[in-house]
């Protein structure tokens, strides 16, 4: 009997609905990386290849984002796919609204919503402002939200329609129409939900094998309750750097996959060559968890490179000092000297002066309260190190290389091992589109191989 033959094209992986909705060739996206590491060059390269990626807006000013969007739209002037990151900003809701207004002016069709605990007025405005009916009366969803979630209670808020109280406020303020509000009441806030397992950067350390089945069940239950015309699409992110990992994600029911760490080590990534040299040499055990600078006081974690770097250990030391002491004056002379000579490379007074100037510029209403609170002042001085360590890495600074903060997950090491002794071994040969196509091509080949193996036992 002739052997069964299974050939799976990479275009067949994942959901056809995802490909159609976003106008892309593959059920794949390159996720946003903050401070423009997911750069204009990266986004335009992906768009020209018919692939989705998200420009990384975290930590960038509105003028910088405006300029980047102008350049992306100029390069992708035939309607090619691209998206932009939209970060929850509870400290500055007005800035979040101005960011959404900027996206609306630029005609951004897709956003990756990150760090949201619950829907906000700007996010709901973005979703509803894209809703309309065509000549035949069908609902047109002009704006897509890809919501990154790692917890079921947050996922549920995106799987439900937009909160009625936020919708009412938007209508009353004339920011969306009554028809858009009515259409939005029948649709989920996000049509794409990206389930984020243990990942680079901010992470809850989730396990994809646990999260994906739970999120699928939640998606199906809410879809039935709300009587949606079609199910919300589920994506998988975190830990995807090899064909085996990608195939596992699709097997768990992912409609699409999102990669991150592996794209930071490509020619187009907007970080320094020094960082890419480090990333290229990583193994699967060369990352660690460290306190997150932007959520320092609450002990949130990021995953970052450990190999050859002191950042994770020094960040943890600063957090422990914060927990043990009530003010900078409580630090003993030896600890203070260590911070000034090794961590900061400048005096604590200099760090505070720089930090105070930043607060006075961005949050003048909070300055007096901070100066009255020694604990808050200490937290801000320690948080300066996290900002500084990111700047060092992105600039490729030679003199403080050990303090680089490089967000990265073990997918990077897995990818490096997979491409060893191939043309993609060196990062200067790694183009973001080539990485995507190689990964998906080999994932499809692996699926075909497994189908043949199982077919032979049928």
Give the positions of each predicted feature.
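Glycine-rich beta-strand-to-loop/alpha-helix junction loops that act as flexible
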Residues: 233-241, 259
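Hydrophobic alpha-helical scaffolding
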Residues: 32, 58, 205, 239, ...
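Catalytic or ion-translocation cores adjacent to nucleophile or general acid/base/metal-coordination motifs
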Residues: 63-65, 244-303
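Phosphate/diphosphate-binding loops
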Residues: 99, 103-114, 285-309
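A general structural signal for short secondary-structure boundary/capping elements
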Residues: 77-80, 131, 281-286, 303-308
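Active-site entrance/lid segments in N-terminal catalytic domains of soluble metabolic enzymes
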Residues: 1-231, 244, 261-263, 398-458
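Domain-length cofactor-binding catalytic modules of enzymes
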Residues: 320-458
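C-terminal alpha-helical cap/extension of soluble enzyme domains
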Residues: 237, 299-336
């Amino acid at each position: 009997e002739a052997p069964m033959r299974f050939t799976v094209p990479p275009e067949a992986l994942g959901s056809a609905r995802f490909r159609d909705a976003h106008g892309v060739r593959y059920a794949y996206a390159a996720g946003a990386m903050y401070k423009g590491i997911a750069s204009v060059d990266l986004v335009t390269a992906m768009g020209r290849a018919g692939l989705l990626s998200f420009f990384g807006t975290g930590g960038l000013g509105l003028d910088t984002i405006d300029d980047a969007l102008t350049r992306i739209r100029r390069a992708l002037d035939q309607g090619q796919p691209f998206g932009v990151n939209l970060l929850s900003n509870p400290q500055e809701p007005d800035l979040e609204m101005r960011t959404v207004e900027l996206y609306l002016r630029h005609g951004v069709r897709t956003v990756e919503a990150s760090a949201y605990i619950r829907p906000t007025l700007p996010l709901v405005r973005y979703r509803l402002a894209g809703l309309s009916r065509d000549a035949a009366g069908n609902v047109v969803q002009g704006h897509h939200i890809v919501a990154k979630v790692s917890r079921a209670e947050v996922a549920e808020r995106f799987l439900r329609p937009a909160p009625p109280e936020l919708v009412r406020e938007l209508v009353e303020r004339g920011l969306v129409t009554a028809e858009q509000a009515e259409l939005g009441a029948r649709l989920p806030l996000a049509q794409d939900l990206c389930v984020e397992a243990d990942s680079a950067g901010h992470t809850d350390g989730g396990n994809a094998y646990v999260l994906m089945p739970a999120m699928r069940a939640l998606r199906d239950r809410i879809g039935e309750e709300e009587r949606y015309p079609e199910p919300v699409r589920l994506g998988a992110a975190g830990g995807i750097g090899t064909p085996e990992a990608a195939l596992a994600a699709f097997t768990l029911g992912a409609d699409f996959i999102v990669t991150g760490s592996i794209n930071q080590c490509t020619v187009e990534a907007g970080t320094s060559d020094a960082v890419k040299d480090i990333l290229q040499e990583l193994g699967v055990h060369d990352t660690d968890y460290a306190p997150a600078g932007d959520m320092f006081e609450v002990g949130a974690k990021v995953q970052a490179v450990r190999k050859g770097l002191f950042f994770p250990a020094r960040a943890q030391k600063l957090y422990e000092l914060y927990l043990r002491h009530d003010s900078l004056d409580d630090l003993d002379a030896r600890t203070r000297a260590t911070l000034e000579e090794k961590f900061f490379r400048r005096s604590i007074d200099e760090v505070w002066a720089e930090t105070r100037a930043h607060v006075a510029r961005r949050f003048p209403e909070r300055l007096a309260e901070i100066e009255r609170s020694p604990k808050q002042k200490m937290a801000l001085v320690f948080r300066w190190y996290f900002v500084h360590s990111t700047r060092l890495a992105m600039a490729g600074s030679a003199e403080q290389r050990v303090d680089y903060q490089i967000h990265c997950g073990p997918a990077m090491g897995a990818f490096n091992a997979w491409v060893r002794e191939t043309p993609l071994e060196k990062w200067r040969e790694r183009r973001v589109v080539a990485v995507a196509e190689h990964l998906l091509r080999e994932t499809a080949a692996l699926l075909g191989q497994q189908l043949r193996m199982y077919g032979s036992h049928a």
